[in-house]
Amino acid sequence: MRSSNNLAKSFALALTSSLTLSALMAVPLQLANSARAASPAAKSTKLKPSKSGDSAQFVSRDATLGIEEYKLPSNDLSILLCERHATPVVTVNMVFRVGSRNEAVGYTGSTHFLEHMMFKGTNIHDPLKKTGLDDVLKKVGGINNATTSYDRTNYFELVPKQAINLCLELEADRMRHLLLRESDRKAEMTVVRNELERGEDDPSQLLEMNTFATAFREHPYHHPVIGWRSDVEGVPTERLRQFYNDFYYPNNATLVVIGDFDKAATLKEIENKFAGIPKSPKPFPPVYTTEPPQEGERRFTVSRGKELARVMVAYHTPRGTDRATYPLDILQSVLGGDSRKSSRLYKRLIETGLASDCYAANYTLKDPGLFIISATVQPGIDPKMVEAAIQEEINKLSEKPITAEELRLARSSISKRFRLSLSDPMGLAQSLTEGIAVGSWKWWASYPRDVQTATAQEALDSAKKFFLDKSKTVGYYLPTDFKTDAAAIAQIKPSKPTENQGDSSSAATSQTNEATSSAGSQTDRADKAKTWQERVERFRLPNGMTVLLARVAEGADSGKASKNAIRGTVAVSGKIRAGDFYSQIGKSAVPDITAELLTYGTKKFSKEQISTQMEEMGVNLDFSNGTFFHEFESEVAAEDLPKLLSLVSSEMRQPKFQQSDLDLVLKLSQAAIKEKMTDTGEVAWNSLVRSLYKPGCVYYAPELSKQMEELSSITLSDIESYHQKYYSPGNTVLAVIGDIEPAAVKKLLEAEFGDWKGETAPAIKVEASGLIDRSGKASKSKLTTELADKANVDIAIGKPVALSLTSDDYLAAMIGNAVLGYDSFACRLAPVRDKLGLTYSISSHITEPHYPYSPWSIDLSVNPTNVDRSLEVVRKIVADFNKNGVTSQELATEQDHLAGVYLVGLRSIRSIAKKLTDYEQLSLPVSYMDTFGKRVKNVTLRDVNKAAGQYFRLDDAVTSVCGSLTIKAEPKQSIAK
């Protein structure tokens, strides 16, 4: 996929990701040669209109999901439409049935490389003429990107509803009119290579890539999705053009449209824009290579870097549409991982101290795939012990059936997760993409029903059939200086029994039907309100806890009950003033450890009961620590809201902190810090903030080795004291948004939180005194940190800025920053990637906008040989930006862009709930959500240039560089004056 930042990161899938179905539920350009470089179809200068008889033909409908299928008879383009009118946004998603399985040696990675090239222009939409896809979409706001996987490629736009026709035009145009210029390929090659290098520096990605390459010797799944380096570097433009002309046709594609649109008008637009595109003139090249049965265990070891060791075990499985997928997905759920404290792998690997994280995944692919179990080994532990433990758990699955309770929980979890994943239009689009890739959208739609028919006996039979030693592949990732530690091994605890001890009904309440609107009145004032100020009800409990409620559901405005299975969900978001701001010097990890321990058991629910109930509801509920706040967010089926709130209340109010749990979390934290110490991005950032802030400032972070030392001083009393002091109703804001009956939810909240007591924390105030005085320092101050065996270098350039969300000039500064470097495309910094190919990703941003003096930074990653050149280009661009300022055209474009992005950011009830808690904690009114677009449009050019000139200069910025560098003039971890 293309690099992304900001909102795009919230849902973009990793390049090589293949979602398991049970988890669904994130060089100079030469114009002179462009005509000759174009494919024959690119000669067209405008899209052909449809002819009579090109009307889309209805094919089928899934009434439960609200999806309708159509087909264009002229070219067999498949069309899936799903109307969602709860929020005014639309997702347009084009899925091509081509992935890395369609490649061979010599042109591996072509699918992904071509995905990048699909943004490089047509005669109509050409970035060189400032009419490219990113240029025109920026004017309407929203998000666009693409992802590539083994079996498919998809291109998507998420935009305000009025931009739907533009998105359809863009997808129709690039389907057959791509220019594919040689100059574009040359520039983009180094971008793709940098993406590849970033993956090489990630031990988990590297291990997975080698696992597939070892398990598959003949089938194209052997090749990494991104391709082999020499193919990426050497593939000629003509080979990419051949690939494009082989697969990019309407009869190899499915167009998915989801959101707030008019069906009849949209179908007409699709007909007009796509019906004139011809279908493929020849059959699509088949994939006829099959993987023969494996005849013996295969092993490999990757030795590099200094990250924690990893173990991966993989077994061959049938194609995704095989009946065995359902029991295998049940087994995946039963094995679980580090995020589920009641699962078998958690008990066997995490609780015993063998591993710091782990997971099981059934890779559901078009052709036979893999079932993978992976674990990150705790420092000092022999990976062979982890492998042996994994093998023991696999053997248990083949020896006796899973329990009836495990089967029930797995079925419930898979069904609920599937349902909840569809509440976000982008989540639905991506889920459909995976289903189309594996089999068909109908197979995907029937999946949650069919998986309910899987039995414990089928799970046992599948384990016996597929989890065989002779079809196993085992991979180790070992750091170059790997050693085992007898003391660490001696601390391993015996595993606990896997029987479930939870009481699935213990959190249920009698108010379930009352709290969900499908059983209550549809006449609330909020149902017919149009503004968020009118729709959101804000009130305080007598103890000072602030609550925000809003009914947001399909059919709410019309007074119709929400009976659709993909609706009827509720988002809950909480924000507590209890972040790093309230930590003590020498105890910086206490806020983070406290947040982590909240899910380890309460006075009412054991750790396993909490995990079991989360699994039953198909949700996660984790508390995270931030600079100023602790927060959590979750989304449940409406009928599960009382159960979720009961758990939230118990975890926030009555956590049962125990020494054994603290010991485990401290050990996991040590492993996490050790990983950070080998991450170029983490190390570069840590060096940067230590050069900008004094100890005691909230934005300062101790050196990573110091953070490791601090963990040993944290006691149970530190955790208890911190929780008692900062977890109180007066510090807490809770938002409940979705398919609710507000009056019933009020009663529920009063019952769960009404008798909660506690003191309100001191107000947050960040002073300039926490900054290191850099006046008079050289403008090119640079920190360099050497890390061995790194293919990629991370660069962070930053400085503190006296700016926050409540600043009068915040919006002006926000616009100025967006002009400079909102993302890697269509901004001032874009040439660093798009023209020069120096980086996969570059952007500028304010790190923590809640309060002033957080870092404003420019972040990028580059090949080690491109560090100096990249820094020179960035400095030149910023200097020009400072000298000439923002133009009136850039202002107008960014005003429209940011207004659209903001609207798209409120596309789901989960994002709405989070935005409400953010604003409430900063004492900003709900009306800010209604007036954002207007306020952005009211910002003047003078305002923007004044703010940009004040905040976004590099004169006093510090540059931090980390990677495998050859630095002769500067000592390691030094600052050059």
Predicted regions and their residues:
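N-terminal secretory signal peptides that target proteins for export/translocation
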Residues: M1-A8
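Bacterial N-terminal signal peptides
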Residues: A12-Q30
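His/Glu-rich zincin catalytic helix
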Residues: V27, L31-G132, F156-V159, L168-L170, ...
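Proteostasis/folding factors centered on peptidyl-prolyl cis-trans isomerases
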Residues: I67-K71, T237, A375, A456, ...
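M16 family metallopeptidases and their MPP-like homologs
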Residues: C82, A86-F113, K129-R174, L206-S230, ...
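Short, conserved secondary-structure transition motifs
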Residues: R193-G199, T289-V302, A410-S421, V636-A637, ...
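Alpha-helical scaffold elements lining the catalytic groove of polysaccharide deacetylases
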Residues: D231-L240, E710-I714, I719
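Bilobed periplasmic-binding protein-like "clamshell/Venus-flytrap" ligand-binding domains
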Residues: E458-L478, G730, N945-G963
